[in-house]
A protein has these predicted regions:
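Carbohydrate-interacting/catalytic domains
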Residues: 28-31, 55, 60-95, 99-273
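Intrinsic disorder/low-complexity signature
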Residues: 8, 13-14, 51-53, 117
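Substrate-binding cleft/loops of secretory-pathway carbohydrate-active enzymes
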Residues: 1-28, 37-43, 104-107
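Glycoside hydrolase catalytic-domain groove-lining segments
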Residues: 24-57, 82-83
């Protein structure tokens, strides 16, 4: 008679895969790319929650920041990239307190969060990032309107493991589309080309590399990117964008792309013999 009354299920497979992936040095992530993509094989078989709960930041497992390899900048950039990936991935979201502060320490039930970290600029910027991206998430219906069906998701780049990049579309019931491009490598990608749905232009709406969040601000496309009639990834049209190192960008599609008409070549006139 309706079971236990629950309507969502924690996606523990996704959680385990991602925690393993995030701890890897970026060089070795290319050999474990399936940790990043396998969840899409079964993402719509249940109504899933994507959990980074208290259980993932205790018992020597490390805080979210503590899971990331690299120096301070790379760790916090990794937190931002992963959080953007989490919010763009199909499914409801759950993150445990403390991640938004960028704290090193694991959760300790006997003490409070490390609020003193907010005396540091980098931790203030991380907190602002979490505030802004959560507001952005709530304001963008393609990110949450269709979380439990293929109608709300379309993969664009999934199998190119050598560069640690994934790109996919999120879509709402009115057909509005966003593209999420996430780079889990410390190497920025300029002019990164991939096939896209037939929209006229794509504008960058959010970048985790924003200077307000502690990013460099150097890896971005300030103007809308026009769709070109260049085949890529199995599509007739594509765009080339900038993806920051250990970063993510979210693009909004606008207008309708129309394939250019082929130019008619003039027939050569035959000269009389």
């Amino acid at each position: 008679d309706g079971g236990l009354g629950f309507n969502l299920k924690w996606n523990m497979g996704w959680m385990n895969d991602m925690c393993h992936y995030l701890k890897l040095d970026p060089w070795f992530r290319q050999f474990h790319h399936k940790d990043l993509t396998f969840s899409l094989m079964y993402a719509f078989s249940e109504n899933f929650v994507l959990p980074i709960s208290h259980d993932e930041v205790v018992y020597m497992k490390g805080s979210l920041r503590g899971k990331m390899p690299g120096d301070d900048w790379q760790q916090l950039a990794g937190v931002r990239a992963f959080t953007a990936y989490l919010l763009a991935h199909p499914g409801k979201k759950l993150t445990f307190m403390g991640a938004e502060l960028g704290q090193w320490h694991e959760w300790n039930f006997a003490s409070q969060l490390d609020w003193y970290l907010l005396e540091n600029k980098e931790n203030q910027q991380t907190q602002r990032f979490f505030k802004d991206i959560n507001r952005f998430y709530l304001s963008q219906s393609p990110l949450w309107d269709i979380d439990f069906s293929w109608e709300g998701f379309e993969g664009l780049v999934a199998d190119y493991n050598h560069n640690n990049v994934v790109v996919f579309v999120r879509r709402d019931r009115k057909g509005r589309e966003l593209i999420a491009a996430v780079n889990f490598s410390p190497v920025g990608r300029a002019d990164y080309r991939f096939g896209v749905p037939p929209r006229k232009t794509w504008r960058e709406e959010l970048s985790t590399d924003d200077t307000a969040f502690g990013g460099t601000g150097e890896w971005r496309d300030e103007k809308p990117v026009r769709t070109q009639a260049i085949p890529s990834h199995g599509r007739e049209q594509s765009i080339a964008i900038t993806i920051p190192p250990l970063g993510a960008v979210i693009l909004r599609g606008a207008g309708e792309y129309k394939k250019p008409k082929a130019k008619k070549s003039k027939a050569r006139e035959e000269l009389p013999a």
